[in-house]
Amino acid sequence: MKRLHWKCYIPRLCQALNEDDPDRRVEFCEWYLAKCADDVKFAHKIVWSDEATFKLNGVIVWCGISALGIIGPFFFNETVNGESYLNLFQEFIGPQITEMFGEDSDIYFQQNGAPPHYHRDLRAPLDAVFPNTWIGRRGPIEYPARSPDLTPMDFFLWGYLKDNVYANKPRTIDALKLEIERQCRDIPNDMFRDVCESLGARYQRCLDNNGHQFEHSQT
């Protein structure tokens, strides 16, 4: 961890798992590790995504990250719903990912199971941009519910960003947005690469713990 020069942000409170969640987590980790065994660059082919709320008056931010860097931030002016997320995907997320990786790249796109990500009108655009390669609720690849410890958005990006954004004490919404944008720009790309390349070891720890939460046992 010291060699990589980045800090792992471990949630203080574990999200309780349902009875069948460990099995779903095992399935996902096994799928990921099998893909990595077949393709040594597979860790570089996933875009991880999520929203987070930054507090002043509650700024909702979407970002995506991959081993190549960050996409976003994009700001929502109100609570995220299916329509606003669909618009963001069509106008920004899909085009930005295509710009980053190229038209013909075999790229995977991950999103969690939040209700806006499950909007009935979103599936067709997802299938069009990422045919059989999007990861999420009822997608071609299921992302396990209640698993923030398996996505670098939660175990890395949001904690890192909030620490750095709040350290500069922005006092207005506009100042907060500018600081979020600046901090996103300032994250070096090799940090994203290192975080994404660390996922294999993290997922192996999950398997070693039979799909149960494992961060409390990290050394």
Model-predicted segments: where are they?
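Surface/interface recognition patches
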Residues: M1-T219
